[in-house]
From Swiss-Prot:
This is Small ribosomal subunit protein uS11c. GO terms for cellular component: chloroplast; ribonucleoprotein complex; ribosome. The gene is rps11. PROSITE patterns: RIBOSOMAL_S11. GO terms for molecular function: rRNA binding; structural constituent of ribosome. It comes from Aethionema cordifolium.
Length: 138
């Protein structure tokens, strides 16, 4: 028969509460990826470590409503609300993708009160790379 393993030490000494490390971040990078189907907003520090993120799907929008400008505005607001509590003051914005939520997400970021050092469009453009998908016939 196997003997039960006894645990040595008490639980009173361990720290209770959240394990999450709350960092003070003065400057960050806000990445907005706007596709036709969804908008994903990720806030990172300058080294690229993710601090907070949100998308239209996690904000409760499902189906075709995820691609709307209002869903992108809500996602940007949710992602930024978490990092404002951590003390972010300055940020740079990198927008990627052709979606409808580009401008709405940028408007929500501007309204949040964070100083934007610059806004950069980093949409990947092919130098005649892969063949695009065929045109839709509706």
């Amino acid at each position: 028969m196997a003997k039960p393993i006894l645990r040595i030490g008490s639980r009173k000494n361990t720290r209770s509460g959240s394990r999450k490390n709350v960092r003070r971040i003065p400057k960050g990078v806000i990445h907005v990826q706007a596709s036709f189907n969804n908008t994903i907003v990720t806030v990172t520090d300058v080294r690229g470590r993710v601090i907070s993120w949100s998308s239209a799907g996690t904000c409760g929008f499902k189906g075709t409503r995820r691609g709307t400008p209002f869903a992108a505005q809500t996602a940007a607001g949710n992602a930024i609300r978490a990092v404002v509590d951590q003390g972010i003051q300055r940020a740079e914005v990198r927008i990627k993708g052709p979606g409808l939520g580009r401008d709405a997400a940028l408007r929500a970021i501007r309204r949040s009160g964070i100083l934007l050092s610059f806004v950069r469009d980093v949409t990947p453009m092919p130098h005649n790379g892969c063949r695009p998908p065929k045109k839709r016939r509706v």
